[in-house]
Swiss-Prot record:
Pfam families per the UniProt record, alphabetical: Ribosomal_S13
Protein name: Small ribosomal subunit protein uS13
Signal peptide boundaries: none
Highest taxon in the source lineage: Bacteria
Similarity remark: Belongs to the universal ribosomal protein uS13 family.
């Protein structure tokens, strides 16, 4: 397994697919990286040479924020929105959809599970 920017990539996958395992790299970015480093996208990760792995790693580190750095930036941005008290920040704080979706009947994932009601036994008279 090749290790690129701290992520173990499976040997049996094609390189362009394996790069999408890295947080912050999707399909189009994966192809961009491989085009600029001169690596064949259809090559398997197990077939990569050490030189190709180091070229890919260097390109990613020089051009993109990925993994922990990207996660912390996103988290900081959300914290800032909450701190300044804007509409989006309030929605984040309340755990509701942020981008204008309706919430009357949907948004179950974002709202979370409903609090369950305590069942009481009926007295038999």
């Amino acid at each position: 397994m090749a290790r690129i920017v701290g992520v173990e990539l499976p040997n049996n996958k094609k390189v362009w697919v394996a790069l999408t395992y890295i947080y912050g790299i999707g399909r189009s970015r994966s192809f961009e990286i491989l085009k600029n480093t001169g690596v064949d996208p259809d090559k398997r990760v197990g077939e990569l040479t050490d030189e190709e792995i180091s070229k890919i790693t260097k390109y990613i580190q020089d051009h993109f924020k990925v993994e922990g750095e990207l996660r912390s930036e996103v988290e900081r941005n959300i914290r800032r929105l909450i701190e300044i008290g804007c509409y989006r920040g309030i929605r984040h704080k309340l755990g509701l959809p942020v981008r204008g979706q309706k919430t009357r009947s949907n948004a179950r994932t974002r709202k979370g599970p409903r609090p369950s009601r305590i069942k009481t036994k009926k007295k038999s008279s």
